[in-house]
Amino acid sequence: MNNFIALEKKIKRTIFLGTSCIYPKFAKNPIKEEYLLTGKLEKTNQSYAIAKIAGIKLCEALYEDDNLDIVCLMPTNIYGTNDNFDKFNGHVIPAMISKFLSAKRKKLRSINLLGTGKPIREFLHASDLAKSIIMSLKFPKKKLSK
């Protein structure tokens, strides 16, 4: 909806935040833009991913049809203040921090981390994402890459 408002009000540039979960569940690392729509999505967040993909496609159409200057950013796994720090179902970094702090308080010598440790993930602090959004507003307009 904000993209339509941007078009109507002649906003110079607007930002659309995507998500790394738009890429196929078994996409090769490092993930590349061209992997979009090349395989099945992770089932647990499929609806969210499809909504984000629809948003990206809308942005592409507004860019091509109406010359609206839109930057689509695909942040990786974000962590930071006010995140989900639950030890059992929180986001990866905050959950690990909670487990480490709890183990330190209890003077434990080891902790149990979930998963196999095999997935490769990238993480970005929320404040760094904010800086990158501001920085992306300042870049000169470039042709949409496909």
Question: Which ranges hold each PLM region?
Answer:
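Alpha-helical substrate-binding/gating segment
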Residues: 64, 78, 93-111, 121-146
